[in-house]
Regions:
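C-terminal helix-rich "cap/oligomerization" subdomain common to oxidoreductases
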Residues: 29-53, 357, 372, 458-525
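Glycine-rich, aromatic-lined ligand/substrate-binding cores of catalytic
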Residues: 64, 270, 275-464, 479-484, ...
Length: 525
């Protein structure tokens, strides 16, 4: 943790003789704290109501788009953190997209207690490192004036941040998907704790390397957002274990995503790079190309190079507890079905060959082998409006499936639930009357994220990993990247998990790894 004039420091009136006579760095060395740990100095030593710097995790926040800022707000309100640096290759609030035009700005104003705050830029939707710095600075000035906060530093390059901010304890990573793995690896190698938004990586091999780095450095506490879910997987497993639907055979999970464009052609125009955007840093490890707003902000998710598609976006919310409860590891077969787009080359139509963006709609089947606790099972993922066939139990009652949901199919019955396994109910089976439907806790995605923050802090204090670490997400990370590889190839894939290779379509193996741009490889980042 830093102790310089640029950071909030205790005033002399808050320190007694004992704490003044013992510099914090000397205190840390005396108790043998590691680079990945921090020391707690009881608040009563410093006075009533004082938040000791040693009580807080010094955090650098990397990625200040709309979702990044949305999740920054609950984090700065958690007194266990002190944000000391922000980073984004985009400086100004220009060209950002969001679910609506005003709600994020209003949330910012309420959080920082300044109802006149404006984002600058094009003055529509907040984003960029200038806004991030402004939010952090004004929050501490207006809400915690007792800290005498002097301001956080702002960087456009995360590598420079790591070089200069030697005393940060942790980072939170909210960049586009293609940078998640690289920045996580950079942090772990520097013994910085990591909170990273899903997916861990949009490449299978890269994700495996980051997970191995986390295994090799257990003192670094890691957390993948989202951890847990809104659902009731424990209830579902109790029903399955009791034989309520017989032997589980299939799981079906469907979403209304994407809610962003999935372009069927590459941009051909060449607009100017917006002032304040470092396009080279935004591209990062990927192949350089001309700037286009169709690549950036919300719509990056639809491109194989920059995003992970609908499953990477939403499957972590719905499937985390499913993977854990059913002990799903690596699938041996992946079967894609996907939409295509046609165009006219007058006077003839043709089908667009596309291996650069996710399809408008798809459903993908993952075949998982049996383990000691269950037989083999198939997992089906659907997006773009695709859904499984309406079960006879609903069809006979003139009902249909909701636009999002989850269905567990056994050889003697079915369990229907919401997308995140919430509000499950048995719709047919051998024990229709005995199970009791359980109410689910409903939390927004931002609420899910914020509920994990105290657990992350406790894990750092206790130097012990907790549920939600990136190692636990290994097989879900693998699945979302096999989803992308199967859609990109358009072919049934046979996967050899031990060797991390596709055995029947050799060309598809290139989609499992990244061809890193010079200076951006994961080995040297």
């Amino acid at each position: 943790m830093k102790n310089d004039s640029a950071r909030p420091q205790p005033g002399p009136q808050d320190l007694n003789e004992q704490s003044q006579s013992l510099p914090r760095r000397k205190f840390i060395s005396m108790v043998g704290a590691s680079a990945a740990a921090f020391t707690i100095l009881p608040r009563h030593v410093l006075g009533r109501g004082y938040i000791a710097p040693s009580d807080q995790v010094n955090l650098a926040y990397i990625g200040l788009g709309t979702q990044g800022i949305r999740e920054l707000l609950p984090l700065i309100q958690n007194t266990g953190f002190r944000v000391i640096a922000v980073c984004d290759p985009n400086q100004h609030a220009v060209g950002y997209r969001d679910w609506d035009k005003l709600s994020l700005k209003m949330n910012i104003r309420q959080t920082i207690k300044n109802m006149d705050w404006e984002s600058g830029g094009d003055n529509l939707i907040p984003g960029g490192r200038d806004n991030g710095k402004s939010i952090v600075d004004q929050f501490y000035a207006n809400v915690h004036p007792e800290l005498n906060y002097k301001g956080c530093n702002a960087y456009e390059d995360f590598r420079v941040l790591f070089d200069k901010e030697k005393d940060i304890d942790a980072v939170k990573i909210m960049t586009p998907d293609h940078l998640h793995g690289l920045i996580s690896m950079a942090a772990i190698r520097r013994s910085k704790h990591v909170i990273v938004h899903k997916p861990l990586s949009n490449r299978l091999i890269e994700g495996k390397k980051v997970i191995q780095a986390a295994r090799d450095n257990q003192k670094v506490i890691t957390h993948l957002v989202p951890w847990d879910s809104n659902g009731s997987m424990e209830t579902v497993m109790a029903w399955i274990g009791s034989g309520a639907i017989g032997t589980l055979k299939e799981i079906h999970n469907w979403t209304q995503r994407p809610v962003w464009p999935q372009y069927s052609s590459l941009p051909t125009d060449n607009p100017a790079i917006p002032d304040g955007l470092n396009w080279d840093l935004w591209i990062g490890p990927e192949t350089m190309r001309n700037y286009n707003s169709n690549y950036t902000n919300m719509v990056f998710r639809g491109w194989y190079d920059f995003g992970g598609g609908s499953m990477a976006d939403m499957g972590h919310y719905s499937l985390w507890t499913v993977f854990k409860a059913l002990q799903l590891t690596s699938p041996h077969t992946i079967i894609p079905n996907l939409s295509h787009v046609c165009a006219m080359n007058e006077p003839l139509p043709y089908r667009i060959q596309n291996n650069f963006s996710f399809p408008m709609a798809s459903h993908v089947c993952f075949k998982y082998p049996a383990n000691g606790n269950r037989p083999a099972v198939d997992l089906w993922w659907y997006d773009g409006g695709m859904r499984p066939a309406i079960p006879e139990e609903l069809l006979s009652d003139n009902k249909q499936l909701a636009e999002e949901g989850m269905l567990f199919v056994g050889d003697q019955g079915k369990i229907l639930a919401g997308f995140n396994v919430q509000d499950p109910k048995i719709i047919s089976g051998t024990k229709m009357d005995s199970p009791v439907q359980m109410a689910s806790v409903k939390r927004s995605q931002v609420e899910q994220t914020s509920t994990a923050l105290p657990l992350f802090i406790d894990a750092i204090k206790n130097s012990k990993q907790y549920p939600g670490n990136i190692i636990e997400a290994e097989f879900l990370t693998e699945a979302v990247n096999l989803y992308a590889a199967s859609l990109r190839s358009g072919k049934l894939l046979k996967y050899d998990a031990g060797n991390r290779r596709i055995t029947n379509v050799d060309d598809a193996n290139r989609w499992l790894d990244r061809e890193y741009r010079s200076g951006w490889d994961i080995a040297s980042i």
